[in-house]
């Protein structure tokens, strides 16, 4: 970890020992949506919701796994990132029980909150839960054959 200056949505932010760009953004008061990051746990980077776009190169990367870099310029809210995040939420919803009224997390669900925040009222993708089960069964069977 180190010290330096980054630019988050044109806001100059000094960082000092923040382990990743997500924490630098939080320090700047810029909230980036995420599902899997928690500062007390090891970085996982699986949800991909915290993607940021590097100015100049257009490269996108997960802010939770990206170390801060001096003079780095990033964008957190481009049209490309919003489209990307909407698709991630839709994919998560496609593998999620859609009968929220019977779920104990109803109205206290981060996925519901994100869907509302990003204006998702309809999921374009088919229900993928059965496909995931089949894939897991196939993987388990293949693993059993190796033992």
Model regions and ranges:
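Signature of N-terminal electron-transfer/Fe-S-associated modules in redox systems
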Residues: 1-134
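Single conserved hydrophobic/aromatic residue that forms the stacking wall/gate
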Residues: 138-147
């Amino acid at each position: 970890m180190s010290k330096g200056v980054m630019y988050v949505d044109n806001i100059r932010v000094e960082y000092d020992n923040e382990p990743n760009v997500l924490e630098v953004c939080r320090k700047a008061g810029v909230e980036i949506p995420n599902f899997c990051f928690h500062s007390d746990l090891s970085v996982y980077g699986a949800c991909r919701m915290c993607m940021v776009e590097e100015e100049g190169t257009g490269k996108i990367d997960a802010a939770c796994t990206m170390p801060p870099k001096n003079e780095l310029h990033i964008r957190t809210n481009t049209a490309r990132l919003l489209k990307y995040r909407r698709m991630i939420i839709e994919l998560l919803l496609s593998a999620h029980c859609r009968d929220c009224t019977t779920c104990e997390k109803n109205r206290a669900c981060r996925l519901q909150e994100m869907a509302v925040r990003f204006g998702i009222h309809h999921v374009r993708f088919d229900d993928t839960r059965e496909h995931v089960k089949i894939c897991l069964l196939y993987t388990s069977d293949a693993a059993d054959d190796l033992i």
